[in-house]
Amino acid sequence: MLKALTVAVILLASAANAGAQTGPAASSPGLAVGPQYDTTHVYVAPEDFDRFVTSFVATFGGSLSKQGVFTVTPTPSSTMSQLVFTPVGTVSVFGFKTPVPYPFGGERTGYLVKDLDAAVRAARASGADVIVEPFNDPVGRDAVVQWPGGVNMQLYWHTTAPSYATLQTIPENRVYVSPGRADAFIRGFLLFSGGTVVGDDAKASGVEIGRPTDTYRRVRITSTFGNFAVLVTDGHLPYPYGRELTGYETSDLDATLAKAKLAGVRVLVEPYSTQDRRSTFVQFPGGYIAEIHATVRR
């Protein structure tokens, strides 16, 4: 299983036309802490846990929190947990030793917030459904929300604020939604995050979704939580498009891929170029799929 949650890993480390909007949305200000606390959630089998962690650090550099076994859900469960800190983004890795309680495993990321109750209220007011009501964990509180289009994310807060290094590049949450729900998702997330649409391309190259003869709509959003790419498609996607959760930006794509291959990472989509990027898709040991890209300077 791939997808996961960030509940207690910190234990280890102690509009209908929203796409046209170009300014920040009216929001509940001050909820976000910073993009280094936007952690992609990765589930792997316990036997693949160390291989994944080792390969991820070998590819991007960085460091690890202490590994442990915890209960990180509001109902009984047990999982291996560890944070991986890299210059291009943080991941929370989980290897469940028990069945995973519903709906955990369906959320893609965890966002650290300054006030969980305020964040949950703001999410509801912005059109999100709270699918896991706030609950206590040993270091704070957590909730899971679902945005229009079925996009699940965790909101979390800790009694003692963690302190992570500033990232060299901001990872990109990559969200695939249908045309019928895209504007509702964009409008709601902008309202919640106070984000800004920095690009809305109605005819982005289909090579980005494995369909080089077609075009599709791609919306890019930035906020204090981090970066978002909203990929609006009809769902006719060849593998592995849509299976990735995050895009990681590196300064040298070829050098990063060389490190990845030495670490046992499999290239699923060979590097290709678009107007502003060279990109590839890879699969890490344990099954986690990611997009990796370098910005093309023109």
Walk through the language-model features, giving the residues of each.
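Bacterial N-terminal signal peptides that target proteins for export
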Residues: 1-6
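N-terminal signal peptide c-region/cleavage motif recognized by signal peptidases
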Residues: 13-15
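Boundary at the C-terminal end of the N-terminal hydrophobic targeting segment
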Residues: 18-22
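Core segments of cupin and vicinal oxygen chelate
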Residues: 31-34, 41-89, 133-148, 175-227, ...
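Vicinal oxygen chelate
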Residues: 35-47, 82-84, 96-122, 141-146, ...
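Catalytic cores of nucleotide-enabled group-transfer and carboxylate-activating enzymes in metabolic
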Residues: 91-96, 128-131
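Short, structured interface segments
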Residues: 143-164
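Short beta->alpha transition motifs characteristic of CBS
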Residues: 156-161, 292-298
